[in-house]
Structures are given as C-alpha cells and as structure tokens.
Curated annotation (Swiss-Prot):
InterPro entries: DUF697, UPF0283. It comes from the Bacteria. The keyword Iron does not apply. This is UPF0283 membrane protein Meso_1416. The lineage of its organism: Bacteria, Pseudomonadati, Pseudomonadota, Alphaproteobacteria, Hyphomicrobiales. Disulfide bonds: none annotated. The keyword NADP does not apply. It is a multi-pass membrane protein.
C-alpha cells in the first residue's frame, strides 16, 4: 500500500499578453475611387409596393379590338360605284328623252340633275367632315392617354390645344380656356396639365351631359308607364337612345352625321359589351328591389324606372365613348347618380296619378 501524497505548492505563470504591435490592424491608406465603377445598385425585379399599388388600382381599360377584314368595305364601295353608274346612265337616258320631246324640258332636266349632284356632293363632304371629326376625337383620346402614361408635357400641351380648338364654339368653356392660357407657363407636368384641362374644359360639359341623360331616362320612364303595348315601349326606348346619342355627340364633338352616327353607335355597343350591360341590368333591378322602391311604386312605373335606368346606362356608355379625354380628374358618373333622381321623379308622378 502506497504512502499518501504530501501536499505541495505549485506556481502558475500567467499567459503572456499580446503585444500592441501584433493586435494593431493595418490601416488602409485613403484613396480616391469612382462611385459609378465601384458601386453598382441592382434594383429588385419585383417591388412589393408597386405590386400592391397595381392590385389596388382600377382595372385597365379594355384593349382595342383588332381590325376586321376589309372585304365588307370593298363590297360596299363596289356596290356604291355600281349604283352611281346606274344612276348616271338613267339620268343620261332621261335627259336625252326630254330633249327629244322639247328643248326646254331637256334643259330643265339637266339643271335638276346638276342641282341634285351638287346637293349630293355637299352631303358627302359634310358626312366626311363629321366622320373625320369623330376620328380626330378618338385619336385625341389615345394621344392624351399616351401623354398621361409617359407624363409628356409637350404632347399634353398639343392635346390641350386641339381640345381648346374643338370646344371653341362652346360658351361654357370660355372661362376654362382663359384659365389654361394663364397657367400655360406655370405647370410643367404633363399629367397635371391634362387634369387641369379636364376640370376646366370638360367638367361643365359633363354636367350638361348628365342632365341630358337624366332627362332622357325620365321621359322613357313616363312613356313606359303610360304606353299600352310593350312594342311601343321598345320603340320609344330605341328612339330616345338614338336622340340621346346624337345630342351627346353634338355636345362634345359636333354633329356626327349619318355615317358618323353609325360609327358612334358601334363604339357605344362595344363599350356596353365590354362593361357588361346585362350584369348592370341585374344590378339595377337589385338596387330598386333592395331599396324598397318597387313596393312604393306601381307595376308600370316600376317597369318605367328599370327602362329609364337602362337608358341612363346607354347614356353613360355614350359619354365614355364620345368624351375627348378619359375620366381622371373628374369623377366618372355612376348608375347611382341617376337612380335617386329617377325614383323620386317616378314616385312624384305616381302620387299625381293616384
């Protein structure tokens, strides 16, 4: 058995501290560098704030329809030339027959043909001017949309100049045109220029257009309530819609003419198809029933209110299709703006009848 170990003392030496020369880092000497070469900022492909703003914004407008085939236009042009040749041959034969009977009858027939030809030429020129004016308004709307998207002040000023010349005959826009002339050098933003022009030039016309739409809707509601046949209702609704389109066109861009009116009607129908007029009709009925309006009105006046609201819907589509600038600074009229006034008018009419 081993002997127990005796206690002993040991000396522990502290660890050596590092020298200041070893711990000191090498200090880099100052030097000049180029920021564009040394620093390169790469933006993120997707910005979360941009995506949130895009989701919250209004839906984009519908894309322009593709151009259709020109076969229909070629057919109409060829048919028109054939009709013109036939009319010319008929007029020549008629004048020859009149000269064979008496000279004065021949000269009278020739004079009447000349007057008819001049009148036809004047009508064609007027229709061409009306169609060109309507096409210029559509181009103006596209140019304003492009200038607003790119914030192009130069193009915005050109659009505003064309708009001022288009609306020069309207006394309601005189104050707005003077205001734009005073602010011509003060505003440098293209978007601000277009917003100011919309408020100063188109806002007074928008109020008149809404009054035209409301008056047409009131007339349709009254005629629907008193007409004995449904066919008369449909006929009057079509008549009122045609007259409303023509008046709105005269308000914004002048008299459309026959062919210009056909083109305008096609644009309005396309706008109604894009926005869903049938769904809007269901919404109108739901609003009328939901507000208890159907219970306060008679059956015929209830039908009149529905037809009047559909007429107002056509008027709203026409305003959007005819207006030279898109709705941005001015609030777009909604179906609710006409519902209250029309139902109050129908209730007052129903009270007078009872």
């Amino acid at each position: 058995m081993s002997e127990p170990r005796r206690p002993a003392a040991f000396r522990i030496e502290p660890a050596p501290s590092p020298s200041p020369e070893a711990t000191r880092e090498d200090v880099r000497k100052p030097r000049a560098i180029r920021v564009d070469e040394a620093v390169k900022i790469t933006p993120a492909e997707i910005d979360i704030f941009d995506s949130l703003e895009t989701e919250a914004s209004a839906p984009p407008p519908a894309a322009a329809p593709k151009r259709r085939s020109r076969l229909g236009a070629v057919f109409v042009a060829a048919l028109g030339m054939l009709v013109s040749l036939a009319a010319g041959l008929w007029a020549d034969s008629l004048i020859r027959d009149l000269f064979s009977r008496a000279d004065w009858l021949g000269w009278l027939g020739a004079a009447l043909v000349a007057v008819a030809a001049l009148a036809l030429f004047a009508i064609v020129v007027r229709e061409a001017i009306a169609v060109a004016r309507l096409a210029s308004v559509e181009r103006m709307r596209r140019r304003s949309d492009d200038a607003y998207e790119r914030d192009d002040a130069r193009q915005a000023r050109a659009v505003i100049a064309d708009l001022s010349s288009l609306l020069a005959s309207h006394p309601d826009t005189a104050a707005g045109r003077r205001q734009l002339e005073q602010l011509e050098g003060d505003v440098i933003d293209g978007r601000d220029l277009l917003r100011i022009a919309e408020k100063e030039l188109l806002a007074p016309l928008d109020k008149r257009a809404q009054k035209l739409v409301l008056d047409a809707a009131k007339r349709v509601s009254v005629v629907t309530a008193v007409s004995p046949r449904a066919l008369m209702d449909v006929g009057y609704v079509i008549f009122e819609a045609v007259r409303l389109l023509r008046r709105l066109s005269e308000l914004y861009c002048g008299r459309p003419g026959f062919f210009g009116f056909l083109r305008l009607s096609r644009n309005v129908l396309a706008h109604l198809a894009v926005t869903g007029s049938m769904a809007m009709g269901d919404t109108i009925v739901q609003q009328i029933v939901g507000h208890g309006i159907a219970a306060r009105l008679s059956a015929r006046l209830g039908e009149g209110v529905v037809n009047g609201m559909m007429t107002a819907r056509i008027g709203m589509a026409a305003i959007s299709a005819i207006r030279p600038l898109s709705f941005r600074a001015v609030e777009r009229p909604g179906i609710g703006d006409f519902l209250k006034a029309l139902t109050q008018f129908a209730a007052k009419t129903d009270g007078k009848r009872t």
